[in-house]
């Protein structure tokens, strides 16, 4: 059990009778072909619409009994109360004693939410106003570099949530861009990305955004230091000063204003984060500045509005018709009860190319835990291994394993129904879009039913002479269809997955808002780096010592 700021103590789903009933149900053999054969209304029963998003989960290995027990399981851990605690600013991040109020970042200005006597909504909209002012200065050409030229390129330097979120969103919404200012992203600490990028940029017209919640992330600050050196090398030739370079070519986004100032970020160019915003939930905050620069503030506000619409649905819809709740419960059923320990995200839309990477971080960093909120070791499976790729590329990469391998894998198919303008009907581009949709539906069908069941349903005779051509089927999947990809629908889609993560964490009784598993490696890297600089032999394990010795011999 865990205590929130309002001293609410929640029940554990693990010890409810519904958990045991689901374990019993999971022991039965599940056949998707049989489930569809038994009920010709199955798809209508296991599908629903929420705003511009349609979800078909009929190809999951569930029936009415499983769904009823999953919903009862959610009630047994007081999921409704947990959702309200999240939305109202209770201390749901128990290990760090913080709220997790990413949903407040998309509340309308007319709303009010108090946290420690402070009106969070007022603070959020003050920050959004600053984002708007800075982004419009860049977009309009009034922001000038040290030589007086307008900014043509913006480089977002960040890692994790400070990189993946803005990168995913700007890529997805690039056709909404209404500026000639290009936006780039750098995250890798080895300098390769930055070095390759700087070769093609003009230092006099390049602006850098340093995004780091702590403003102490070594990956980010090492790239920022290199960027500063690159700028200063040109500024000296143009009689520019270091102060003018820092002032005209850097914006900082962090929860640590003191460190931003110490680095040299001008106070007017510092954007605030709050401790109650987790990195992987932060694209809605000032971290989204790169998005606002690329698609404009009106587009960014539509992104926020789409997410808020999903927040409302999550908070108000009955669980049986609640898309995030159902998506989360199905994920728990697959991972914990059916032992489906791998999950893949398959968007059939090139604009969503970074969505799988974004969701990999969102789910695995949030729910990759083995201890409950009250410190007990977990005796059940939690977050599956998650990966993904654009569907058409994945078909030529790992679909072989999905169709004919030995691993059980659950899948999310994501596609957009409408693409291109009405004037583009029956053009080659429109035909390509229809071909992509056809592949999306076809692949989910083959994964679900295999060649034997499909042949039978189509009135054909299945041939089993060539065993190597056998498609076993019975791979569970959910299909999510957006009416079309817009800032609003993308916001709703991202928020859907955020809430899915929270539902799963609530059932598993884990904290999805911390990430202690990333800390020790970073700390150890400091010791290893120190050892690299010293002449004497390192004092680690024999493998690490030998690797260091080899590196030193070649350096």
UniProtKB/Swiss-Prot annotation:
Annotated keywords: Cytoplasm, Gluconeogenesis, Glycolysis, Isomerase
Reactions mediated catalytically: alpha-D-glucose 6-phosphate = beta-D-fructose 6-phosphate
Pathway: Carbohydrate biosynthesis; gluconeogenesis; Carbohydrate degradation; glycolysis; D-glyceraldehyde 3-phosphate and glycerone phosphate from D-glucose: step 2/4
PROSITE patterns: P_GLUCOSE_ISOMERASE_1 (PS00765), P_GLUCOSE_ISOMERASE_2 (PS00174), P_GLUCOSE_ISOMERASE_3 (PS51463)
Classification lineage: Bacteria, Pseudomonadati, Pseudomonadota, Gammaproteobacteria, Moraxellales
Superkingdom as given in the UniProt entry: Bacteria
BP term (GO), one: glucose 6-phosphate metabolic process
Keyword Cytoplasm appears in the UniProt entry: yes
Molecular functions per Gene Ontology: carbohydrate derivative binding; glucose-6-phosphate isomerase activity; monosaccharide binding
First-level EC class: isomerase
Entry's localization field: Cytoplasm
Gene3D superfamilies, per database record: 1.10.1390.10, Glucose-6-phosphate isomerase like protein, domain 1 (3.40.50.10490)
One GO CC term on file: cytosol
Active site positions: 365 (proton donor), 396, 522
Keyword Isomerase: yes
InterPro entries (alphabetical): G6P_Isomerase, G6P_Isomerase_C, Phosphoglucose_isomerase_CS, SIS_dom_sf, SIS_PGI_1, SIS_PGI_2
CDD domains: SIS_PGI_1 (cd05015), SIS_PGI_2 (cd05016)
Family membership: Belongs to the GPI family.
UniProt protein name: Glucose-6-phosphate isomerase
Annotated signal sequence range: none
SUPFAM superfamilies on file: SIS domain
Record's function text: Catalyzes the reversible isomerization of glucose-6-phosphate to fructose-6-phosphate.
Organism encoding this protein: Psychrobacter arcticus (strain DSM 17307 / VKM B-2377 / 273-4)
Matching Pfam families: PGI (PF00342)
EC nos: 5.3.1.9
């Amino acid at each position: 059990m865990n205590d929130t700021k309002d001293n609410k103590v929640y029940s554990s789903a693990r010890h409810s009778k519904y958990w045991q009933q689901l374990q019993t149900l999971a022991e039965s053999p599940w056949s998707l072909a049989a489930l569809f054969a038994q009920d010709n209304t199955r798809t209508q029963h296991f599908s629903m619409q929420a705003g511009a998003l349609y979800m078909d989960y009929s190809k999951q290995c569930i029936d009415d009994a499983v769904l009823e027990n999953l919903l009862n399981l959610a009630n047994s851990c007081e999921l409704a109360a947990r959702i309200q605690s999240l939305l109202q600013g209770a201390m749901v991040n128990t290990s760090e004693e913080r709220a997790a109020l990413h949903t407040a970042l998309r509340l309308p200005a007319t709303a009010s939410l108090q946290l420690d006597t402070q009106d969070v909504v007022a603070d959020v909209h003050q920050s959004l106003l600053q984002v708007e002012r800075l982004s419009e200065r860049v977009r309009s050409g009034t922001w000038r570099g040290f030589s007086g030229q307008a900014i043509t390129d913006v480089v977002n330097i960040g890692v994790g949530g400070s990189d993946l979120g803005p990168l995913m969103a700007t890529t997805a919404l690039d056709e909404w861009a209404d500026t000639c200012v290009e936006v780039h992203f750098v995250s890798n600490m080895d300098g390769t990305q930055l070095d390759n990028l700087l070769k093609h940029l003009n230092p006099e017209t390049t602006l850098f955004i340093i995004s780091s919640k702590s403003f102490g992330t070594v990956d980010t600050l090492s790239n920022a230091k290199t960027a500063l050196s690159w700028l200063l090398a040109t500024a000296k030739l143009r009689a520019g000063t270091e102060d003018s370079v820092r002032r005209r070519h850097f914006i900082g986004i962090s929860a640590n204003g003191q460190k931003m100032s110490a680095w040299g970020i001008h106070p007017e160019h510092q954007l605030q984060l709050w401790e109650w915003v987790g990195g992987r939930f932060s694209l809605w905050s000032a971290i989204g500045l790169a998005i606002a620069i690329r698609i404009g503030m009106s587009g960014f506000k539509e992104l926020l509005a789409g997410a808020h619409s999903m927040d409302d649905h999550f908070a108000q819809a009955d669980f049986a018709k609640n898309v995030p709740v159902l998506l989360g419960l199905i994920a728990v059923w697959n991972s914990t009860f059916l032992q489906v320990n791998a999950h893949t995200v398959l968007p059939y839309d090139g604009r969503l190319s970074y969505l799988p990477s974004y969701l990999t971080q969102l789910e695995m960093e949030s729910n990759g835990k083995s201890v409950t909120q009250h410190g007990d070791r977990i005796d059940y499976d939690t977050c599956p291994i998650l990966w993904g790729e654009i569907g058409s590329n994945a078909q030529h990469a790992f679909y072989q394993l999905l169709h004919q391998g030995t691993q059980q894998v659950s899948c999310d198919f994501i596609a957009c129904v409408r693409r291109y303008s009405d004037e583009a009907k029956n053009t080659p581009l429109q035909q390509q879009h229809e071909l992509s949709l056809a592949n999306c539906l076809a692949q989910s069908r083959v994964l679900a039913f295999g060649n034997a069941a499909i042949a039978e349903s189509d009135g054909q005779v299945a041939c089993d002479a060539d065993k190597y051509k056998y498609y076993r089927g019975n791979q569970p999947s959910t299909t999510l269809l957006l009416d079309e990809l817009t800032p609003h629908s993308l916001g709703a889609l991202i928020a859907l997955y955020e809430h899915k993560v929270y539902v799963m964490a609530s059932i598993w009784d884990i904290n999805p808002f911390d990430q202690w598993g990333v800390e020790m490696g970073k700390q150890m890297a400091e010791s290893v780096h120190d050892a690299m600089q010293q002449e004497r032999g390192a004092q680690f394990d024999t493998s690490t010592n030998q690797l260091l010795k080899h590196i030193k011999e070649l350096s």
